[in-house]
Amino acid sequence: LKSMELNEKNYIRFQGTKSLKDYYKEENGNAVFDKSLLANVSFRKHDLVMGEVFNKFDLILCRNVMIYFNQTLQNEVLKKFHESLFRYGYLAIGSKESLIWCDYASRFIVVNNEEKVYKKIKD
Protein backbone atom coordinates (compact mmCIF):
# COMPACT_ATOMS: atom_id res chain seq x y z
CA LEU A 1 0.00 0.00 0.00
CA LYS A 2 2.98 2.28 0.40
CA SER A 3 3.37 2.57 -3.39
CA MET A 4 -0.28 3.63 -3.62
CA GLU A 5 0.65 6.92 -1.94
CA LEU A 6 2.79 7.82 -4.97
CA ASN A 7 0.09 6.56 -7.32
CA GLU A 8 -2.47 8.74 -5.53
CA LYS A 9 -0.22 11.80 -5.95
CA ASN A 10 0.18 11.06 -9.67
CA TYR A 11 -3.56 10.52 -10.01
CA ILE A 12 -4.24 13.91 -8.44
CA ARG A 13 -1.51 15.55 -10.53
CA PHE A 14 -3.22 14.33 -13.71
CA GLN A 15 -6.60 15.56 -12.48
CA GLY A 16 -8.37 12.26 -11.91
CA THR A 17 -12.10 12.73 -11.49
CA LYS A 18 -12.50 10.64 -8.33
CA SER A 19 -10.25 9.45 -5.55
CA LEU A 20 -7.87 6.68 -6.57
CA LYS A 21 -9.19 4.77 -3.54
CA ASP A 22 -12.52 4.43 -5.37
CA TYR A 23 -10.85 1.96 -7.73
CA TYR A 24 -9.29 -0.48 -5.28
CA LYS A 25 -9.77 -2.07 -1.89
CA GLU A 26 -7.23 -3.17 0.68
CA GLU A 27 -6.78 -6.90 1.20
CA ASN A 28 -4.06 -8.31 3.46
CA GLY A 29 -2.01 -5.13 3.17
CA ASN A 30 -2.24 -5.07 -0.64
CA ALA A 31 -4.19 -2.91 -3.04
CA VAL A 32 -6.57 -5.02 -5.12
CA PHE A 33 -8.02 -3.18 -8.10
CA ASP A 34 -11.58 -3.64 -9.30
CA LYS A 35 -11.46 -6.31 -12.03
CA SER A 36 -13.95 -4.36 -14.17
CA LEU A 37 -11.16 -1.83 -14.83
CA LEU A 38 -9.44 -4.45 -16.98
CA ALA A 39 -12.54 -5.44 -18.97
CA ASN A 40 -11.36 -3.61 -22.11
CA VAL A 41 -7.62 -3.88 -21.51
CA SER A 42 -5.36 -6.27 -23.37
CA PHE A 43 -1.71 -6.88 -22.68
CA ARG A 44 0.32 -8.23 -25.55
CA LYS A 45 3.86 -9.42 -26.00
CA HIS A 46 4.85 -8.18 -29.43
CA ASP A 47 8.03 -7.98 -31.49
CA LEU A 48 8.13 -4.29 -32.37
CA VAL A 49 10.66 -4.85 -35.14
CA MET A 50 9.45 -7.98 -36.91
CA GLY A 51 5.82 -8.11 -35.81
CA GLU A 52 2.97 -6.89 -37.96
CA VAL A 53 0.13 -4.59 -36.95
CA PHE A 54 -2.44 -6.96 -35.43
CA ASN A 55 -5.14 -4.76 -33.92
CA LYS A 56 -6.37 -1.21 -33.30
CA PHE A 57 -5.89 0.39 -29.90
CA ASP A 58 -6.99 3.49 -28.01
CA LEU A 59 -3.74 3.59 -26.04
CA ILE A 60 -0.24 2.25 -26.62
CA LEU A 61 2.32 2.42 -23.80
CA CYS A 62 5.89 1.86 -24.95
CA ARG A 63 8.19 3.44 -22.41
CA ASN A 64 11.97 3.55 -22.77
CA VAL A 65 12.28 0.93 -25.49
CA MET A 66 13.00 2.93 -28.62
CA ILE A 67 16.09 4.55 -27.11
CA TYR A 68 17.81 1.26 -27.91
CA PHE A 69 16.89 1.45 -31.62
CA ASN A 70 18.61 3.45 -34.36
CA GLN A 71 16.61 6.24 -36.00
CA THR A 72 15.51 4.13 -38.98
CA LEU A 73 14.20 1.38 -36.73
CA GLN A 74 12.51 3.90 -34.44
CA ASN A 75 10.71 5.35 -37.45
CA GLU A 76 9.53 1.88 -38.54
CA VAL A 77 8.21 1.16 -35.05
CA LEU A 78 6.42 4.52 -34.89
CA LYS A 79 4.82 3.77 -38.26
CA LYS A 80 3.42 0.56 -36.76
CA PHE A 81 2.20 2.44 -33.69
CA HIS A 82 0.51 5.00 -35.92
CA GLU A 83 -1.21 2.25 -37.92
CA SER A 84 -2.22 0.47 -34.70
CA LEU A 85 -3.90 3.46 -33.06
CA PHE A 86 -7.46 4.54 -33.63
CA ARG A 87 -7.73 8.19 -34.65
CA TYR A 88 -7.51 10.24 -31.45
CA GLY A 89 -5.76 7.34 -29.73
CA TYR A 90 -2.87 7.99 -27.35
CA LEU A 91 0.78 7.00 -27.50
CA ALA A 92 3.01 7.25 -24.42
CA ILE A 93 6.75 6.85 -24.94
CA GLY A 94 9.77 7.22 -22.66
CA SER A 95 10.82 10.52 -21.17
CA LYS A 96 14.05 10.53 -23.22
CA GLU A 97 12.23 9.66 -26.47
CA SER A 98 10.57 11.96 -28.98
CA LEU A 99 8.49 12.03 -32.16
CA ILE A 100 10.12 15.23 -33.46
CA TRP A 101 12.29 13.50 -36.07
CA CYS A 102 9.64 10.93 -37.02
CA ASP A 103 8.02 10.89 -40.47
CA TYR A 104 4.70 10.67 -38.63
CA ALA A 105 5.24 13.59 -36.25
CA SER A 106 2.69 15.79 -38.04
CA ARG A 107 0.02 13.14 -37.43
CA PHE A 108 0.27 13.53 -33.65
CA ILE A 109 -0.13 16.38 -31.20
CA VAL A 110 1.63 16.63 -27.86
CA VAL A 111 -0.72 16.07 -24.94
CA ASN A 112 1.96 16.19 -22.25
CA ASN A 113 5.53 16.95 -23.27
CA GLU A 114 7.04 16.16 -19.88
CA GLU A 115 5.47 12.69 -19.80
CA LYS A 116 5.82 12.23 -23.61
CA VAL A 117 2.16 11.55 -24.28
CA TYR A 118 0.90 12.10 -27.82
CA LYS A 119 -2.51 11.97 -29.48
CA LYS A 120 -3.03 10.72 -33.03
CA ILE A 121 -4.91 13.34 -35.04
CA LYS A 122 -4.49 12.11 -38.62
CA ASP A 123 -4.71 8.72 -40.29
Where does each model-flagged region fall?
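Extended basic-aromatic, gly/pro-enriched interface segments that bind polyanionic ligands
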Residues: L1-L59, V65, L73, L99, ...
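ABC-family nucleotide-binding domains
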Residues: N70
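A short glycine-rich, Lys/Arg-flanked "PGG" loop and its adjoining helix->strand segment in the class I
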Residues: N75-R87
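Conserved beta-strand signature within the Rossmann-like core of class I S-adenosyl-L-methionine
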Residues: R87-S95
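Short secondary-structure junctions
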Residues: A105-V111
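Short hydrophobic/aromatic beta-strand or adjacent loop that forms the aromatic wall/cage
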Residues: N112-V117
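Flexible, glycine-/basic-rich loop-and-beta segments that form/coincide
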Residues: D123
